[in-house]
Amino acid sequence: MNHEAIKKAGEIIASKANYVGGGMEGYAVLALIDENGYPSASALTIARADGIHWLTFATSPDSNKAKRISKNNRASVCIASSTYNITLVGIIEVVDDLEVKKDMWFEPMSHMWSGHEDPNFYAIRFKTERYNIFVLDGENVMEAVGVL
């Protein structure tokens, strides 16, 4: 296990959480299995994260993502650029816990929901089980593949 690569990946993910600069810079791609058994990917803003261990995103309880998660809780998250590719595989759940939602709330979410107490605002919590990390840091290439 390459601790440097894991640490750097965690720093990259942290820099993406609550990103409001526009473009794809703050997004992660979440892959779920749809109702027909096919992969379905969505670009989402990371609300909160703990390194590569867990990430949270926002959704509504009646969204396609919430429906897919209720049928199959296996997921993958990919955060990539020209200098890194962080692919995480794990389990995911829809969470309606006020403390979790309060912790992950940030102001740009107000274009979709009225606040962390909005009944249509739910958290999606992804927990990593496996990872595949590639980071180019200057001339230093860091790679790590493993299980948490």
Regions found by a protein language model. Name each.
Residues 1-7:
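Short, low-complexity N-terminal intrinsically disordered segments enriched in polar/charged residues
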Residues 12-35, 75-77:
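A short, Trp-centered hydrophobic/proline-enriched beta-strand micro-motif
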Residues 23, 39, 70, 85, ...:
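Short solvent-exposed loop/turn micro-motifs enriched in small/polar/acidic residues
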Residues 25-53:
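N-terminal leader/targeting helix
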Residues 30, 69, 123:
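ATP-grasp fold ATP-binding core
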Residues 32, 59, 79-81, 90, ...:
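Residue-level recognition of conserved beta-strand positions in structured domain cores
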Residues 45-82:
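A short mixed-secondary-structure module that forms the rim of ligand-binding clefts
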Residues 87-148:
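Charged, gly/pro-rich active-site loop segments
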